Curated annotation (Swiss-Prot):
Residues annotated as catalytic: H117 (pros-phosphohistidine intermediate)
GO cellular component: cytoplasm
Protein family: Belongs to the NDK family.
Pfam families, A to Z: NDK
Subcellular location: Cytoplasm
GO biological process assignments: CTP biosynthetic process; GTP biosynthetic process; UTP biosynthetic process
Keyword Acetylation: no
UniProt name for this protein: Nucleoside diphosphate kinase
Record InterPro entries: NDK-like_dom (IPR034907), NDK-like_dom_sf (IPR036850), Nucleoside_diP_kinase (IPR001564), Nucleoside_diP_kinase_AS (IPR023005)
Record carries keyword Phosphoprotein: yes
Signal peptide per UniProt: none
GO function terms (MF aspect): ATP binding; metal ion binding; nucleoside diphosphate kinase activity
Length: 142
């Protein structure tokens, strides 16, 4: 099976709750390689650009307000079957529906403030990683 790339964003609620280290430890313990990482505060326009796929949805403004409300940590991850494995690790978008022991079940407070973003497909993983990191900043693990 080929190595896949996915993008995680440890959201502003993760940073506010001081859970960044614990979430990263869980990600690494699950076998993911960290290939790029930085702490940023997205502008409203940057959040709108990243989440443009949702611009027609009723939650778009609240989502982009939240994502630009404070620091977040985008992280490029690689692993075989990265997309599916990461989505399993983080759990359902709604923490009340997330399986016990998942990151969202353990740390998230709501559907919006759900600790972490994860890419939903290999093509989106590549595209989303490129939104935050030029290719020369991504250190592929061999």
């Amino acid at each position: 099976m080929a190595t896949e790339r996915t993008l995680a964003i440890l959201k502003p609620d993760c940073v506010r709750k001081e859970k960044v280290g614990e979430v990263l430890r869980r990600i690494q313990d699950a076998g993911f390689q960290l290939c790029a990482m930085k702490m940023i505060t997205m502008s409203k326009a940057e959040a709108e650009g990243f989440y443009a796929v949702h611009e027609d949805k009723p939650f778009f403004d609240d989502l982009t307000d939240f994502m630009s409300s404070g620091p977040c940590v985008p992280v490029v991850l690689e692993k075989e079957n990265a997309i599916a494995d990461f989505r399993e690790l983080i759990g359902a978008t709604d923490p009340d529906e997330a399986a016990e022991g998942t990151i969202r079940s353990d740390f998230a407070g709501s559907i919006q403030e759900n600790i972490v973003h994860g890419s939903d497909s290999p093509s989106n993983g590549q595209k989303e990683a490129g939104y935050f990191f030029p290719e020369h900043e991504i250190v592929a693990n061999t």
